[in-house]
Each structure stands twice: as C-alpha cells, then as structure tokens.
Amino acid sequence: MEIKKQTNLRGELTVPGDKSISHRAVMFGSLAQGTTKITHFLEGADCLSTISCFRKMGIDIERNASEILVHGKGLHGLSAPSETLDVGNSGTTTRLISGILAGQSFTSELNGDASIQSRPMKRIMTPLLSMGADIVSLRGNGCAPLRITGKPLHATHYQSPVASAQVKSCVLLAGMYADGITSVTEPVLSRNHTEIMLNYFGANVTSQGTTASIEPEPVLNGREIKVPGDISSAAYFIAAGLLTPGSEILLKNVGINPTRDGMLRVCKAMGADITLLNASTEGEPTADLLIHTSSLHGTTVEGEIIPTLIDEIPMIAVMAAFAEGTTVIRDAQELKVKESDRIAVVTEGLKRMGADIQPTDDGMIIHGGKPLHGAEINSYLDHRIAMSFAVAGTICDGTLTIKDGDCVKISYPEFYEDLYSLGK
C-alpha cells in the first residue's frame, strides 16, 4: 500500500461503529431473551469472528445492510459447538467469550491466528481457575488454543494486576454463572462498556472506584443498540486533520466515553484545535468532533490516562514525531502484548522515516520536529500500525509504503477510501 503526501484534508466522516461495543452487543444479545437490534455495527473481521462463534453455538444472527438482528436464547441457551471456535485475530472475542464458556454445560475449544496464539491468556485463566473453571492452554504456554469445560462456578473477588477491560469483562461474564456476587478490582479504571451495556440489558452491575461487581443469574432482555463511532478509528483522522496543512475535518457521532477519551485529552495538551459539537448521551456519550490544523508540541503521557488511550498510542507517537519538542510515553508496557509489540514496531517504523525515537521498557521517548521522509514500513499485520503510518505518509515528504496494509480490515475496512476522500 503506497501513501503520498496530501494537504487540505477537508470533509465530513462517520467513522465505523465502536469495535468494543459491537463485540459486546452480539455477545450480550446472544445471552438475552428475545431479539437485539444493532445498528452501525462494525463490519470488521474481529467483530465478524464474534458473530461466527455465537452462530456455532446455536444463535440465529441476521446480517443485512443496515442492522444486525441477534435472536438470543437466554443465559443458558447456548449449544455445544461441533467444531473449534475460530476467534481469528480478536483478543476481545477470545477473552470475553472464555468467561461465558466457563459457565456452560459443555466443552469447547478456542483458537485463532498466529497473533492470537502468542498473546497472553494466563491473565484470564488465573481468575477463571480461581472460580473453579476448567480451562487449559492446549500447548501449555498460557496462550491459545484453549479448551474450556463448563462447570458450576464460585463467586470471586479478583484483584487484577493489570488494568484491562478484557480481563475485567471476562470475570464479570463468568460471574453471571457463579454462586454469589463476583467483583473485579483494577489498579486503574479501564474502559467500562461492559458495565454500561450489561446494566442496559438488565443485569445488576455496580461500580465503585476501580471495582466492578455483578450479581449472578441475571435475566437479560433483548435491546436496541445504536453503536457510536469508534474513537480509536477516529484517532487517525484527528491526527491527520491536526497535522496536515489547511485541514478541517468533521467526525460525526464519535463515542467520547471518559474511559476512552484519553486521545482527546493528549491532543489538547499538545495544543490541538478540537471542538466538540452536538454532545449527547444515549447509553454511551457521543459528540461530533471538529478538527482544524494545529501547531503541536510535545507532552508527557503516563499513569491513569494510559488505559483510556492504549490503542491510540501508535498514532500519538507518530503525532509526537511531527510535533515540536519532546514527548515521553510511559506506563504502557501493555503495548508489548498487543497484535504486535507496538513499542518495537512503532520505534522501527519511525526510525525508518528519520525520527528521533528511543524505546523504553514501558513506552518511548520521541524528540519531535525533524523532517520525516517516506520509507517502507512493515505493519506486522497490526491494523493500528498500518493506519498510524498511513497518516504519517500523508504528512511526510516522498512516498510511504506499508507492507500488508490491508490488515486494516480487522477494524476499519474502508480506511484508505475514507482517508483519500478527504484529500480530493
């Protein structure tokens, strides 16, 4: 995929539906009684993996051009799959569905692509085992493939060593099948889409500080879900609009949940001209984002803000390379166990472009403001790497080439079309 320099990015976009919310809408709709209607669902490969898994467990899910209809069968309505559940590239599918499968009356196996087979699953196995679950890493390395034999589960009060919405959600979903109230305490609050949506479906989930608790055996009822635009997908156009001369971009109906809005806060700290318009809340808070070209400067990104922007850090690092001054990113060691080692991969790519960047154990230090040039960038099949460097390619001199650039289909199949539509 070749990307060339652009100026005057102008226009209006509706970015794809939020990936986290799309996954959860299908999962919770499958466990609800009645039909759940989902609009603005993300038709990316990861979310389609979730649909595939639940279809294999007997759930009727209809897809058409404008909506998804999930005909749920209740909390105990899933059927034993006749084949391995293929999660593809989706860590969210793997970790959340494991919590559900732990409480079923059947045995199932989960597997995915090479990336999934290297990502850490002990972080969900540990709390599930403490609840009495039977979950095994078939290669004995704490990674997929996993075999899960459903069993009666015990309630737990789990102290998670990582701030991870996937871990928290896995435990809360298993808690629906437990014998008492189950809770998860995190070191820092992670995204809270599970808590919001489970309550909307009829569960009793309470949150206090960094602890979330769920009562067992909830009766979930089918609902209508309007998925907001994904702020992680919007991030690329926020950055492109800020960095490309003469730009004005309006991003419509973007989710601005405070557990996800760290990108906006960092951009503001860097001097960004971003205006929120038409703010509203319908389950999740949303707004239109108006982006104008801005002169950016370095900042420090650390601490409690990290879980709110963990997926946006590759894009923030690219922004920092074009900004004046030094940007320090720390407390982000979680980047090492994403679809790629994003600390190493971002560092490699930016160095190829001529940036001054040093990796650290938990982040990176970027001395911005140097002229950057086109280069050949390896995406390592990581969609967020491909999109971050595509934005870099619209700003730097020369042509930037992205190896395996089509991996964007994981979360944003129309990404390149949308990017080029703004430059016309």
Regions found by a protein language model. Name each.
Residues 1-424:
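Structural preference for solvent-exposed beta-strand-turn elements
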